[in-house]
Amino acid sequence: PDGTTTTLGREGSDYSAAVVANILDAESMSVWKDVDGVLNADPKIFPDAEQIAELNYLDTIELAYSGAQIIHPKTIKPLQNKNIPLYVRPFGDKRKPGTVIRGMSAPVVVPILILKKDQVLLTIRSRDFSFVLEEKFATIFSLLERFRIKTNLIHNSAVNLSLCVDNSWHIDEAIEALREAGFDVMKAENMELLTVRGYTDELWRKYA
C-alpha cells in the first residue's frame, strides 16, 4: 500500500509463474531446481533420499506444510484450479524427467521424511487443572496467532496441551501472554520434529 515496495516472499517467482499459467490456460508449467525433482527427503540430511516420480496437488501441499522446501503451497493453488500439471526439473540436466505434480497420480511408494530443526515444545496446562476443551483451545491459539507462532504438531490429553512450534523472536512474549491468561507453560528448546509419511518398522529402527 502507499507505493511501498514488497516481495511475494520465498518461491515468489514460482507463484508468479503459476498465476500466469492459470491466466493463459497453459498446458503445463515447469520449474527448474538444483535437484533432480521432488525427493522423499532432504539429501543433505538423508543421504539415501530418492526421487518421487509423481505427486498429486494435495500431497504436495501437505508436504510443503510439513516443511518440505521444494515447492511453496501458494504455487499449487492456481495450477490446481485449472488442473495444470507442474513439472519440477533439474537445471543441471534438462534431459531428466524430474517430478510431475497433477490432479491424479500414482500412489507414493517410498516413505517421505521431513526434518524441521529449531523447534520449541510448549506444554500448556490450565492452573485450575480443568479440562483443556474448546474454550481454552480458542484462547491458546488466538494468543499464538497474535504473536505469529506457527504450530507444527498438536497433542492433547485431559489437562495438558503439547505444541511443537517454530522458534520465534516472539516466543517468550507468547508464553508470558499465556501465563497471564491463566496457564502454566513449560518450554523445551532446541528440539527437532521428524515427520514421516509411509512409516515402516525399518524406518523406526533406523531413526528412533
Residue ranges and their predicted role:
Residues P1-A208:
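C-terminal catalytic "cap/lid" subdomain
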